[in-house]
């Protein structure tokens, strides 16, 4: 178990936080670190926080003082989540920070898939390269690129989170009929959805209705090859499938077979590979979903803010491996305890404060899987003996304390 003590008595008494950057992070985000409180850079040693984009941390040996990792982006396949949770290290991501960039690319993907715009551009260039008078051949050749409009077509969206929800609302504004599937739909997201979006409980209802299907879900063991031969067989013939989520969500062999038979009219993906690039009716891009300056800036700013909020106040926002919990400050001292999610832990912890005659001003506790997080604001400071007793309590992974 580790202990981080912050005095908070005066600015000069607060130790500098050390933040290591594992990738180039936008200055828009880095400038949100107060220079008097934070040392930030790629050469920082023994960091208390790590900022990362795509660098692989799977085999990284964490220093004992590491308290948190923030990913400036959404996917966290490059971070060992279970190992971090066991060590009491929350991993933060930035859901929604790149949502608009991805949304715009989804609309672009539907248009490209409908009218084969990349193929049309390629054809024009081929005509010019062959010496043809392009101005005279285009009228005859353009008929090969006729495709449907989006208006009054049906879009199916798998995953109605930060990205899927704004894709849905934008598609409604384009005159599309929208069906969404998300078994984990939150109340907040549901309230943001346009009232004309149809939310279905059975994904097959979405498959059979949709002219276009787009996925906005995390890659997990359960979502691996979610779009397989069985799923494709349930879809409307001639569907156009867009995958800007993760390549592994789609079974490439099943998709290629469906493209060959015409079951799928086009597959537009942000995750190219050599096999896909040789197939007709595939539009493959080099993972451009979040590749806008605005998106990179938003992700960096959100990553820095969540990291600071945890280090300075113990609040956990947008964590992918530990309970989500925030609590307004009250009292004189705050203790945050990450522990195993087992019976009796809350009673064990609070009894130690009562034994020392310290009143609990506010308390919150939440669990996620095998772990739970307890935040306690106390009416007076506890002695070092109490802090040490909490730290040594069985099943405690991390104890964080700071003064108000």
Task: Kindly give the residue locations of the regions a language model identified.
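An N-terminal-biased, well-structured beta-alpha scaffold segment characteristic
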Residues: 15-94, 208, 228, 240, ...
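Rossmann-like adenosine-cofactor binding region
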Residues: 58-60, 183-276, 291
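Glycine-rich Rossmann-fold phosphate-binding loop(s) that bind the pyrophosphate
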Residues: 160-161
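N-terminal Rossmann-fold NAD(P) dinucleotide-binding loop
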Residues: 164-165
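Rossmann-like dinucleotide-binding domain for NAD(H)/NADP(H)
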Residues: 237-329, 373
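Short glycine-/aliphatic-rich beta-strand segments at the starts of folded cytosolic domains
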Residues: 329-339
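Conserved small/polar residues in nucleotide/adenosyl-binding loops
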Residues: 400-404
């Amino acid at each position: 178990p580790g202990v981080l003590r912050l005095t908070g008595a005066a600015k000069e008494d607060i130790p500098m936080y050390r933040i290591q950057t594992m990738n180039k992070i936008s200055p828009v985000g880095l400038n949100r670190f107060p220079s008097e409180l934070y040392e930030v850079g790629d050469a920082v040693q023994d960091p208390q926080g790590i900022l990362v984009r795509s660098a692989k941390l799977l085999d990284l040996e964490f220093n004992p003082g590491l308290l948190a990792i923030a990913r400036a982006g959404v996917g966290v396949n490059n971070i060992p989540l279970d190992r971090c949770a066991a060590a009491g290290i929350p991993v933060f991501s930035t859901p929604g920070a790149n949502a608009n960039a991805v949304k715009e690319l989804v609309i672009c993907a539907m248009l490209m898939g409908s009218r084969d715009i990349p193929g049309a551009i390629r054809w024009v260039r081929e005509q010019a390269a062959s010496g043809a008078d392009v101005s005279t051949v285009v009228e005859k050749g353009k008929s090969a690129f006729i495709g449907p409009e989006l208006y009054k077509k049906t879009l199916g969206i798998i995953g109605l989170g930060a990205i899927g929800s704004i894709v849905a609302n934008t598609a409604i504004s384009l005159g599309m009929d929208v069906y969404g599937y998300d078994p984990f739909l939150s109340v907040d997201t549901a309230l943001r959805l346009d009232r004309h979006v149809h939310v279905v409980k059975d994904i097959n209802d979405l498959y059979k209705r949709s002219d276009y299907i787009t996925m906005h879900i995390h890659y997990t063991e359960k979502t691996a090859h979610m779009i397989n031969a069985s799923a494709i067989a349930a879809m409307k013939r001639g569907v156009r499938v867009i995958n800007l989520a993760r390549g592994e969500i789609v079974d490439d062999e099943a998709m290629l077979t469906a493209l060959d038979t015409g079951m799928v009219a086009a597959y537009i993906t942000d995750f190219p590979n050599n096999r896909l690039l040789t197939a007709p009716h595939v539009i493959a891009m080099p993972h451009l979903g979040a590749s806008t300056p605005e998106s990179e800036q938003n992700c960096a700013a959100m990553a820095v803010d969540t990291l600071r909020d945890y280090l300075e106040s113990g609040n956990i926002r947008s964590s992918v491996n530990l309970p989500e919990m925030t609590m307004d400050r009250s009292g004189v001292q705050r203790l945050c305890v990450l522990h195993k999610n087992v019976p009796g832990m809350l009673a064990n912890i609070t009894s130690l404060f009562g034994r020392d005659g310290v009143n609990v001003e506010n308390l919150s506790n939440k669990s996620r899987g095998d772990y739970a997080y307890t935040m306690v604001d106390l009416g007076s400071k506890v002695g070092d003996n109490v802090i040490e007793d909490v730290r040594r309590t069985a099943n405690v992974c991390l104890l964080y304390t700071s003064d108000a």
